[in-house]
Amino acid sequence: MQFIDQAKIEVEAGKGGDGIVAFRREKYVPTGGPSGGNGGRGGSVFFVADENLQTLLDFRYNHRFQAEKGTRGGPNNCTGAGGKDLIIEVPCGTTIYDAETGELLGDLTEPQQTLLIAQGGKGGLGNQHFLSNRNRAPEYALPGLPGEIKQLRLELKLLAEVGIIGLPNAGKSTLISSLSAARPKIADYPFTTLIPNLGVVRKPTGDGTVFADIPGLIAGASHGAGLGHDFLRHIERTRVLLHLIDATSDDVIRDYNTIKEELQAYGQGLAERPQILALNKIDAVDRETVDLEALATQLNHLSYAPVFIISAVTRTGLEPMLQEIWGILDQMKVPEEVEALR
């Protein structure tokens, strides 16, 4: 499954500080020469890849970024302070284009990979630089140069091998948070997740598996209800589906069938995709009144899929479930685009 997130922003490097006109005025140097210092260089703008970021969502609310200006020069040949560079963090996998020309400026694929995107302006020259035999007391200096301004288009492409599906509040965001370093928004109301959350889960071998928490589906999603087609499309290219079911529900079988019917109605082979079921939230279940093992057996008979009894909160049962997922993935051919992201 490939996610393409886009954002358009403007970045501006800092203007260089102005050079100044100044002359030496020491007590015993009555005819002191020029001593105006140069302006400081403006700050530059850099992009840095951060493995803890998952989307370009922040750029939808903040479209303009500007580095600090350099300060003006000082007397006694003092150069002004340089402007602070601006570091903009983006997720690994972000591609940066010039929005006006379409030129590819950079592709940040590795953690901490850095790209200079806009150069700060040079500081202006102070009048000390214009001293000559003809002009012993120059009374002019140069202003600092402007920093580069660029209109940019950012694109983020990520591929997920495992799609976590289920009704709203089944615990998908909590699970992906427990399994990986992702920290999705988590709250106890439907549709908390409005965009897919991505997390990389490491195998004991060190290889990473990309999991996607697909926003909650509801009855009628295949016809556009709720968050509808947008999120069913997100799971078309997943290789394995992890179907999370709330064990505290008053009708676990109904909940399972709701998602199953939506996958079948949508088509695209989703219902035939390799699937694992997980009864979640067992930490909140009264084991004296709810027979989890019987529910798991019933779900297994309905789905012909392995069923695990887990708690995303306490991490109970997660390891056997992961081993099953990795076993299925190991038996399948790895797409080239997924391999490239490992």
From Swiss-Prot:
SUPFAM superfamilies (UniProt xref): Obg GTP-binding protein N-terminal domain (SSF82051), P-loop containing nucleoside triphosphate hydrolases (SSF52540)
A single MF term (Gene Ontology): GTP binding
Binding of Mg(2+), residues: 173, 193
Compartments reported by the entry: Cytoplasm
Similarity field: Belongs to the TRAFAC class OBG-HflX-like GTPase superfamily. OBG GTPase family.
Protein name, per record: GTPase Obg
Cross-referenced InterPro entries: G_OBG (IPR031167), GTP-bd (IPR006073), GTP-bd_Obg/CgtA (IPR014100), GTP1_OBG_dom (IPR006169), GTP1_OBG_dom_sf (IPR036726), OBG_GTPase (IPR045086), P-loop_NTPase (IPR027417), Small_GTP-bd (IPR005225)
Gene Ontology biological process terms, A to Z: ribosome biogenesis
Residue ranges constituting the Obg domain according to the UniProt record: 1-159
EC number: 3.6.5.-
Chain residues that bind GTP: 166-173, 191-195, 213-216, 280-283, 311-313
Protein's UniProt keywords contain Acyltransferase: no
All copies of domain OBG-type G, residue ranges: 160-330
Assembly mode: Monomer.
Primary site of residence: cytoplasm
PROSITE patterns associated with the record: G_OBG (PS51710), OBG (PS51883)
Top-level EC class: hydrolase
Cofactor(s) annotated in UniProt: Mg(2+)
CDD domains, per database record: Obg
Organism: Nostoc punctiforme (strain ATCC 29133 / PCC 73102)
Keyword vocabulary terms for this entry: Cytoplasm, GTP-binding, Hydrolase, Magnesium, Metal-binding, Nucleotide-binding
Primary role: An essential GTPase which binds GTP, GDP and possibly (p)ppGpp with moderate affinity, with high nucleotide exchange rates and a fairly low GTP hydrolysis rate. Plays a role in control of the cell cycle, stress response, ribosome biogenesis and in those bacteria that undergo differentiation, in morphogenesis control.
